[in-house]
Amino acid sequence: MLAITQEQLDAVVREAYDHAHACCHYAPTDRSFPVGEDGKMDCTGLMLRALWWAGYVDRAMNCDEADQLMGDLGFVKSTDINDVYTHHGFVQWCEPHNVGTEHVNHTYYSLGGDGRTISKYDTGSDPRIDAVQPYVGVPVDEWGGTLVFKHMWILPEAPDKGIYLKVGD
């Protein structure tokens, strides 16, 4: 088990966003490794680059593979949309026709919020990558129903020892 605190995860997500902001452009599928090394970063790339810097990712993967990885690493999957307001973590959305499948259409990192809006880091388009982030005061359903909440990956808490991710068996 490799330990990582919530503050450390927030910091590596910030570093991944700063990397994207400084030198990357959007690509629908970023299959480079390390993620973003080719100057491209999709929305899942933010998650993968952060996890690579934290030592949990060792290869390029697509969005669906990354979603499976989160469970394998020991993140807790929450299907309660209210957790987006109260927790930090990777939030995943899908198009309505993908509900009930494993497919994910968009990923961002939530920093929690006030019950109406959240703050977040988000890549996946040049305007997002070029923006000053974290975004603050964003409505959770900013897509007006074109995307629906799928789930959120949250770090499990370990009493008195920070937060741990499961790596390997």
Regions flagged by a language model, labelled:
Residues 21-23, 30, 89, 113, ...:
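Generic alpha-helical secondary structure signal
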Residues 6, 10-13, 48, 56-149, ...:
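...with weaker cross-activation on analogous glycine-rich loops/strands in unrelated enzymes
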Residues 18-21, 52, 56:
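Short helix-capping and hinge/turn segments at secondary-structure transitions, especially at repeat
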Residues 1, 163-169:
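Viral virion structural and adsorption modules
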Residues 35-54:
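Active-site nucleophilic cysteine motif
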Residues 11-41:
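Active-site nucleophile-His-acid catalytic modules used for acyl/amide transfer and hydrolysis
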Residues 28, 151-156, 167:
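Surface-exposed beta-strand edges and flanking loops
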